[in-house]
Structure formats: C-alpha cells, structure tokens
C-alpha cells in the first residue's frame, strides 16, 4: 500500500488495520475508517492530511447518560476521535505500513487548544474528521482538526501530540 497519497471512495484503512496501529478498543475506539491519507513528507512545509470517520449510533454507551431523552454525542468524544485520527496520521507519516512498530510506540496528546463546538452531533450522524499537519519536528506533531456532519462544521480544535516508546506497566 503506497500511503504517500491515498484517496477515493473505498476506505484505505478499515477497523482491523486501525486496531493494528491504535491501542484503543471498544468503547473507546472512535475511528471506523480512513478514507484519505497523505503522509507528511516535509518538516519545513507540512503537507500531511487525513480524512477519517466514525458512524455515531444510538448503541454508544455514552448515550445511556448523555442524554437519555435527547442523545447528543459529547464534545469530548469528538475531540478524542480527532486525536485518534491524528495519531494515525502521525504514525503512518513516521513508520508507513510498519504496523509491527505500533506495538512499541504510543501517541500522547500534549495540548488541545482553540476548541469550538458548533452543532450537536446525534445518533445516525457520520462524524467526519479532517486533520492537517500544521507543524512537525522530530516526534512532535501539531495538527489542525475539523469535524463535519454532512459537510457542516460541527467542531474544531488544534492538537499537539508526540509519538514515544510504549512502556510496559
């Protein structure tokens, strides 16, 4: 798979491939598919990009309490989904297809800034995450993130993350 520039109507990463890279599992795995991915190839002129999505269903555990009579997908879950998509972008930019490397690495998010929630996300929505690399130096990544439902901006944030060695605890 050439991940330097991959796009189209078919997913380039399904949930099985995502689970090989991210350590998250149900109920906290918040990316269902990756539709587009451009590896970041330049630190001086960042060009990395990812488009991924999560299908929000009424079966999400979070709706048991948020809110039972008017379910709204929490903003914090939207940000976590953005962070997971950003982790995929950073990992693939650094290690390509080498999913074996994922066992030794973990992505930590350091800051989340300029968060805005614009429109509620509800069951039945497809939450589309679009992230681009703003800056990259070594293992540190700064990402601009937007989330959309039906092409309407529902939330946005700037994220800073680092990829580091995973330590056994």
Swiss-Prot record:
Free-text function comment from the UniProt entry: Involved in unsaturated fatty acids biosynthesis. Catalyzes the dehydration of short chain beta-hydroxyacyl-ACPs and long chain saturated and unsaturated beta-hydroxyacyl-ACPs.
Organism: Helicobacter hepaticus (strain ATCC 51449 / 3B1)
Family: Belongs to the thioester dehydratase family. FabZ subfamily.
Pfam family, one: FabA
InterPro entries: FabA_FabZ (IPR013114), FabZ (IPR010084), HotDog_dom_sf (IPR029069)
BP GO annotations: fatty acid biosynthetic process; lipid A biosynthetic process
Cell location: Cytoplasm
Broad enzyme group: lyase
EC assignment: 4.2.1.59
PANTHER family: 3-HYDROXYACYL-[ACYL-CARRIER-PROTEIN] DEHYDRATASE
GO MF annotation terms: (3R)-hydroxyacyl-[acyl-carrier-protein] dehydratase activity
Gene designation: fabZ
Entry keyword annotation includes Flavoprotein: no
Active site: residue positions: 66
Catalytic activity as recorded in UniProt: a (3R)-hydroxyacyl-[ACP] = a (2E)-enoyl-[ACP] + H2O
Protein name per its UniProtKB record: 3-hydroxyacyl-[acyl-carrier-protein] dehydratase FabZ
UniProt key word Lyase: yes
Domain of life: Bacteria
GO cellular component: cytoplasm; membrane
Keywords, comma-separated and alphabetical: Cytoplasm, Lipid A biosynthesis, Lipid biosynthesis, Lipid metabolism, Lyase
